[in-house]
A protein has these predicted regions:
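Polar, enzyme-active/binding microenvironments
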Residues: 1-103
Length: 103
């Protein structure tokens, strides 16, 4: 997934979050805060997402909104979440400069 650098309100779907015991049951009632969502920008140290958590969509998939702070670094963006009761979830996105994104 491609994201535009330093741009607010970019929606990303992450998941599925599956039960850590059976590995197949969708976890649909998790409370995911911004500090649960960890980001690594272009290979840098992992930090908490700036603000806003995750909202369940369906089937264990959650929507998160990235803001301009979350997307201020060009390159690979790793999104990682590990909530108690669920297996870890990872997603890779790529942040592009505005001129490249809009081309």
């Amino acid at each position: 997934m491609f994201l535009k650098q330093s741009t607010a309100s970019q929606e990303v779907v992450i998941g599925p979050f599956l039960d850590e015991d059976d590995g197949k049951t969708a976890e649909t009632g998790l409370t995911i805060s911004n500090t649960d969502i960890r980001l690594s920008k272009a290979g840098a140290n992992i930090v908490a997402k700036n603000s806003g958590g995750g909202t369940h969509d369906e089937l264990g998939f959650y929507q998160i909104t990235l803001d301009a702070t979350d997307t201020n670094t060009v390159g690979e963006l790793l999104i990682a979440v590990h909530k108690s009761g669920a297996l870890p979830v990872f997603k890779y996105c790529y942040v592009l400069e505005e001129a490249i994104y809009d081309a």
